[in-house]
């Protein structure tokens, strides 16, 4: 149902409300039920996370509606966060918090950029649009920042978010989970490049098409620029957010 909501509401829901369940799981296994993350629960949650990542990214790769693609990527990226929770310990919890904060910004930005694409072309269907790179190159750049961050390309925030998760997974000998996470990143790149190629690179199906510049989209542009700047700022200087996440993780499970 996410793909049917108005763009501002959709961006808010995708960025924030999808994290409520994740926060509940994290709190339940730390403050509310200390010691609840037993080895068998960690194992089960890790495989659930791997399956979630795969199912989400395969759904994204299949669809042509930008909203559906991005909605399925919510599922996939929640899988990464669940994997960090499954890894447990201070490092896993710090990775959980860092990934969550990064994803709030990136996912909200992607849905807002998709709305700008819809404003310019009149459709979310990738098969019915095109030519935006030539018509609006700034919009193309604005899409690439959150898209490549979602994939985990440096020097963007998503690179550090995934690095924290994968480092801890390898440190615990979870090779299978690491392989799944890397494979999902490749499929994420495929689906983001599908949007790029179809919406921006290929010519528009209608040779007479011109982008709609009459709509008042300035607030949307400002919001996307701010979110993109945050993504880039975290990517170029991640240590402050890593330190914050580690400090916050140390408090989990230690509250009275």
Language-model region placement:
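Hydrophobic transmembrane alpha-helices and their helix-loop junctions in integral membrane proteins
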Residues: 1-163, 167-189, 193
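Cytoplasmic/organellar membrane-interface segments at the starts of transmembrane helices
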Residues: 5, 126-127, 134-139, 192-256
């Amino acid at each position: 149902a996410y793909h049917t909501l108005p763009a501002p509401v959709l961006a808010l829901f995708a960025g924030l409300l999808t994290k409520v369940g994740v926060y509940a799981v994290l709190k339940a296994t730390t403050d509310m039920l200390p010691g609840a993350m037993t080895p068998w629960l960690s194992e089960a949650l890790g495989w659930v996370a791997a399956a979630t990542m795969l199912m989400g990214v395969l759904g994204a790769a299949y669809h042509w509606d930008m909203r559906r693609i991005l909605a399925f990527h919510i599922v996939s990226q929640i899988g990464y966060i669940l994997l960090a929770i499954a890894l447990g310990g201070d490092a896993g919890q710090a990775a959980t918090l860092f990934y969550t904060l990064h994803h709030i910004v990136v996912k909200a930005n992607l849905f807002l950029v998709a709305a700008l694409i819809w404003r310019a072309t009149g459709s979310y269907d990738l098969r019915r649009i095109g030519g935006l790179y030539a018509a609006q190159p700034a919009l193309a750049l604005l899409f690439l920042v959150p898209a490549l961050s979602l994939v985990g390309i440096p020097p963007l925030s998503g690179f550090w978010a995934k690095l924290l998760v994968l480092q801890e997974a390898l440190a615990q000998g979870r090779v299978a989970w690491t392989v799944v996470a890397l494979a999902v990143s490749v499929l994420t790149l495929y689906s983001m490049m599908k949007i790029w190629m179809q919406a921006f690179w290929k010519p528009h199906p209608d040779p007479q098409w011109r982008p709609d510049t009459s709509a008042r989209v300035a607030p949307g542009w400002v919001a996307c620029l701010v979110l993109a700047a945050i993504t880039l700022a975290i990517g170029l200087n991640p240590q402050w957010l890593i330190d914050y996440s580690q400090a916050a993780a140390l408090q989990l499970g230690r509250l009275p």
